Amino acid sequence: MLLRQIFAHAYPFENSDSGVDFSSPDTKIQAVNSGRLSFVFLAEQNRIKAFLKIVKPGFVRDNIAFSVLCTEECRLHSSIPTFQTYRGKNAELHQTVPEHLEGLSGELSLFSGQSITLTEAALDGIDEIPETLTEIPGGRRGQLALMEKLGGYIVKVSRTCSVVTDNLPKGLETADPAGFATGRQVAREDFEISEYLTQLHNSSDRKELQYHIQHLLPNLGNSPEAQSFREGLQRGDLEVILDCFNQLEKNIHESLIDNPAPNVPVLNEVKPANVGAVYDAAVNRWEITQSFDFDNMGFGTSENGDQTLLEKDLGRTLSFFAFDPESGEFYADNAKATIKGYLERLPEKMNEAEIHRLQDYIQLGIVTSYFWRSSYLAEELQGKPTEILLARPDPGVHVTQIRSFNTWLKTNPFADMVEALQSTPQMERHRDIEREAVLFRNSPDYHTKRAEGTLPAYDTELDAAHDKINCIE
């Protein structure tokens, strides 16, 4: 009843073109997902479906509005498929839950102040990419074809949404582009430690961390997830992760001082839960059919000085798709395929600094996953278990992933692998196409097509030109 009133207030039927009347008892509302930062509900009325996302208490972020704008930008001006975002009260694309609602006794203590967005839903469901690599259709061939498609998708999303960044809402606070401030904050909150202690400056810090963790371990229960988490902490997983995190921060910051990155405004976390795709086994080809959840964006402008890195996004994607989620094994062929698709969409080769940063960002992606997975167990670890039950995968696998990657690097220079991929005649032809695309995006013709609404057709032609080169291969 409370949710129905919240949704009806934010999206009044008479003012909304969504086609869903939330005040009607005929409208069915069900929870379909609970992620780390948000609840997702599915509303259905007369076969019309819509997704409603509510940001969880404590996670209100100013870039929610920006991510909604990016969703609309992709839908209207590119070949990237997204759902339509509906406008609510005052024609706004995102809503805020009020403190009180007329006719409702008591305030909305749980949801008050949270952001809501409403988007259409696919009538036949979402084309989900399996979380487990072995479940991806087509076996190894299907995996590699998907990896290549996702590599190019990373660049397409950033390029398309950069237009939104040029017109950021005033007063919008930027996210943390390099990922270190956010990562350190999550580590502090997960394990109730100070920022200073996350730095592990000396042996005294390490002893203090070990003592602190030992003090928390009795809080963990007897579930398989909690027991596995306890075993990982006892063998020093958190120290391994923090050591890796601190070294990566040093490496990347030093790299950016010596070789500043170009300002690439948009980063989107490309992982199975954020992309829908279908597989054509006859030609071993994937088509991306849905793109959503742009909440994990970092962006920068010339005014705030943030320099976001496109290779960071590729590294994050590789941390999902180039490692076995259960054994932690590194799959070099998956990494090569994803990097190949990424390189095909760049107008120039990656330079040495970018390649080294990519290697670091793969590991940072793994470290980030450890922190986020730990957060699902954090309340129990701190003696404050919650009644909200979520899937809680073992964070310890990410320590294994880091070790597996480092073992591979000992005999396989990462830079040599990337250089071999980007130094083929076919790759030069891909770059020629992208150089022409850069010229187009800086021409009057671009603005004409944007005004006409014909940019998606241009984007589709660009996709076809790249596909033609790959078919000849």
Where are these regions (language model features)?
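Active-site activation/catalytic loop segments of kinase-like enzymes and analogous catalytic loops
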Residues: 280, 307-348, 364-384
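ATP-binding glycine-rich loop module of kinase domains
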Residues: 41-62
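ATP-dependent phospho-/nucleotidyl transfer catalytic cores
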Residues: 106, 110, 129-156, 163-267, ...
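Conserved short submotifs of the Hanks-type protein kinase catalytic core
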Residues: 100, 118-126
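Conserved HxN/HPN-centered segment at the entrance to the catalytic loop
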Residues: 77-92, 96-97, 102-105
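ATP/Mg2+ or Mg2+-diphosphate-binding catalytic cores
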Residues: 368-473
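Active-site acidic catalytic loop and adjacent metal/ATP-binding pocket
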Residues: 33-44, 246-312, 445, 451
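Juxta-kinase regulatory segment immediately upstream of eukaryotic protein kinase catalytic domains
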Residues: 1-23
